[in-house]
């Protein structure tokens, strides 16, 4: 896999996204993804200072990084088997076509390099049969166990299958859409359990700013009511920890209505639905009077 992307390690037993490389940690920090350092010393496992890699990510962090093209999943054999079993025939065919297209691009690059060499020697590719055979021999690609000729050895189809497994089994789509909405608004997000929330939102890097919002899990925008006592309790909780108490939901019906107007059928699969549509999100902030 090209080193321009961050490697996110997944284990079939825990399902927790981890980042082990310090350069990758620095890179995703620049993208606004925080995570939590969870590495400790074997002789002092209870210590809570000077924690190091790996960096533990929220599932929303990992999905956002992969869908944005900034990262890829590194997984064990068991998870690979589960993901491969969910691939469709069309995805396998697309995978093969992408692989062959990459090989052909490599061959074309070798042809151009060889022609430039011949031109530098004031020769042409149409001299003798011997020279043409030598030229053709140089166009074959060796695919060793650790090939440097073809860097993209990780099939995109498997990455999509792993992503589908994560979204279907472990991720709430409404929570992810609120997460994505806040990320698009340039907020930094981390887990908010210590403040009675799903996320804690910062207006910038947490080393420079205090968190401003305690974001609650996504609500059913059309059917779930917001109890007045819940509003009062949330407002007082937000005031007590010096944060806005934020609730929100996803307006799925608007996206489905737009798809119907365009004579498109919304995909039934959760991931395909996420990729094909972009339903709008509404969020509301609540604070107790006299806040601050």
Curated annotation (Swiss-Prot):
Gene Ontology BP terms: tRNA-type intron splice site recognition and cleavage
EC number: 4.6.1.16
Originating species: Eremothecium gossypii (strain ATCC 10895 / CBS 109.51 / FGSC 9923 / NRRL Y-1056)
Top-level EC class: lyase
A molecular-function term among this protein's GO annotations: lyase activity
Protein name: tRNA-splicing endonuclease subunit SEN34
Matching Pfam families: tRNA_int_endo
Chemical reaction(s) catalysed: pretRNA = a 3'-half-tRNA molecule with a 5'-OH end + a 5'-half-tRNA molecule with a 2',3'-cyclic phosphate end + an intron with a 2',3'-cyclic phosphate and a 5'-hydroxyl terminus
Xref: InterPro entries: tRNA_endonuc-like_dom_sf (IPR011856), tRNA_intron_Endo_cat-like_sf (IPR036167), tRNA_intron_Endonuc_cat-like (IPR006677), tRNA_splic (IPR006676), tRNA_splic_SEN34 (IPR016690)
SUBUNIT field: Heterotetramer composed of SEN2, SEN15, SEN34 and SEN54. Interacts directly with SEN15.
One Gene Ontology cellular component annotation held by this UniProt entry: tRNA-intron endonuclease complex
Keyword entries, A-Z: Lyase, tRNA processing
Keyword Thylakoid in annotation: no
Function of the molecule: Constitutes one of the two catalytic subunit of the tRNA-splicing endonuclease complex, a complex responsible for identification and cleavage of the splice sites in pre-tRNA. It cleaves pre-tRNA at the 5'- and 3'-splice sites to release the intron. The products are an intron and two tRNA half-molecules bearing 2',3'-cyclic phosphate and 5'-OH termini. There are no conserved sequences at the splice sites, but the intron is invariably located at the same site in the gene, placing the splice sites an invariant distance from the constant structural features of the tRNA body.
Family indicated by similarity: Belongs to the tRNA-intron endonuclease family.
Catalytic center residues: 202, 210, 243
